[in-house]
Amino acid sequence: MKELSRRDMLGMLGMAPLAVGGVAQAFAAPSETADARILPGAQTLSAKARRRIQEQHLPNIPLVTHEGKRVLFYDDLVKNKNVSMNFFYANCDEVCPLVMANLAKVQRLLGKQVGRDLFMYSFTLKPNEDSVDDLREHRKMLGAQPGWTFLTGKPEDIETIRAAIGFKYPDPVIDGDKTQHIGNIRYGNEPLMLWSACPGMAHADWIAETLEWMIHPQVDRVQKS
């Protein structure tokens, strides 16, 4: 599979943003200008609106990290943070290795910002097969640094999160194919409830630049490799 160009990436950003009824404006539509909406001094949502979105799209589900630590999806991983999220599984031999290697490059480009200004999360789609040890070894193989956490949990909980953050198709046949859920990255600013997505095979420097727009809207971008 070829690495996607910027034109390809923008053309594929039709993946639906998270949205809840009357507060759908809280989520940035996936577009070329979406990140420009995250501006210094922007007002956070009301507590009521933020809670409403959280309850539908950011469930407080228990998970386990690659270190064996028990965490809650919303309270511990997402609340008050800038995050990126994707799905994979260890024995995937097609798209997953390419996307995960690309994310490793994104982390290198962002450097110490990951774990401080941005938190990266990768969830296994096969929690019955991928043990905590498997996640830890996979992470080590990729050379992942602090700030990039691999996660597992009960199969039904992983499925709940997958659907809640928008990695779900209405066609049950397509939705049941795990390879349909491993090619995209969901990213967002939780305090402002601004969310979008990008293809995991876009150029790593463009993904990093997009994430930096979310973190630091008016500072110099990462150096392209």
What are these regions (language model features)?
Residues 62-82:
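A short beta-strand-turn-helix
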Residues 75-97:
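Short active-site neighborhood of thiol/selenol oxidoreductases, capturing the structured segment around
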Residues 58-59, 83, 182-183:
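Short loop/turn microsegments at loop-to-beta-strand junctions
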